[in-house]
Amino acid sequence: MNTNKYLAEMIGTFWLTFAGCGSAVIAAGFPQVGIGLVGVSLAFGLSVVTMAYAIGHISGCHLNPAVTLGLAAGGRFPVKQIAPYIIAQVLGAIAAAALLYLIASGAAGFDLAKGFASNGYGAHSPGQYNLVACFVMEVVMTMMFLFVIMGSTHGKAPAGFAPLAIGLALVMIHLVSIPVTNTSVNPARSTGPALFVGGWAIGQLWLFWVAPLLGGVLGGVIYRVLSPEPTGVVEGVKAR
């Protein structure tokens, strides 16, 4: 069994969670020079771009259970690899959240009650959006994310541009949905911070598994019907 791809997924998801959530926890509201919503959106997108070039040839650079499941639904990824990929991704996200907590808690005034980049709905949505609105947003955003991934890694797509297209798509997704759910589209990314916040974050975590996984499957299936891959099974950005 080749464990390199699982280790690559763990490291890649660690980077996405640490860089993305870290930008929100540490840098977003920093006095005078805080990066704000746009900066956080860019951090998440850039984390995917950089990892796609770093580990795309090893694991396909999924970094996200919804991407793994969506690619499988789209005929681009072997079903037997779904579970180990997701386990590796979740472990990477938890490790990132642990390191982020270690660093962030070293600042005076640090308070987990501020959310620690967790995702939420209702009273815990940044814009106080209700459960239905948050669920729909996560499904649609993840569906479109998979649509871009499937398209940019298709055998007929221009070679070499998939990481940029995927990263920019994630930036756009965050720009739209941070006010609604604080943007998940990634169950692993949601799980890491939620475990440290506890309470409401864990109680609401179900939505940030169910909605992204559903959206991922929808995106994969729809693109598979729209434009079947002529070259067989690939593993994400690996083939491009």
Curated annotation (Swiss-Prot):
Motif interval(s): NPA 1: 64-66
Reaction(s) catalysed by this chain's protein: H2O(in) = H2O(out)
Topology with respect to the bilayer: Multi-pass membrane protein
Annotated transmembrane regions: 10-30, 35-55, 90-110, 131-151, 160-180, 202-222
Site label Involved in tetramerization or stability of the tetramer, positions: 21
Keywords: Cell inner membrane, Cell membrane, Membrane, Repeat, Transmembrane, Transmembrane helix, Transport
PROSITE patterns: MIP
Residues with site note (Selectivity filter): 44, 174, 183, 189
Compartments, as annotated in UniProt: Cell inner membrane
CDD domains named in the record: MIP
InterPro entries per the UniProt record, alphabetical: Aquaporin-like, Aquaporin_transptr, Aquaporin_Z, MIP, MIP_CS
Motif NPA 2: positions: 186-188
Broad class of the protein's primary localization: membrane
GO molecular function: water channel activity
Entry-linked SUPFAM superfamilies: Aquaporin-like (SSF81338)
Domain notes: Aquaporins contain two tandem repeats each containing three membrane-spanning domains and a pore-forming loop with the signature motif Asn-Pro-Ala (NPA).
Family, per entry: Belongs to the MIP/aquaporin (TC 1.A.8) family.
Function: Channel that permits osmotically driven movement of water in both directions. It is involved in the osmoregulation and in the maintenance of cell turgor during volume expansion in rapidly growing cells. It mediates rapid entry or exit of water in response to abrupt changes in osmolarity.
Protein name, per record: Aquaporin Z
Organism for this UniProt entry: Rhodopseudomonas palustris (strain ATCC BAA-98 / CGA009)
Organism classification: Bacteria, Pseudomonadati, Pseudomonadota, Alphaproteobacteria, Hyphomicrobiales
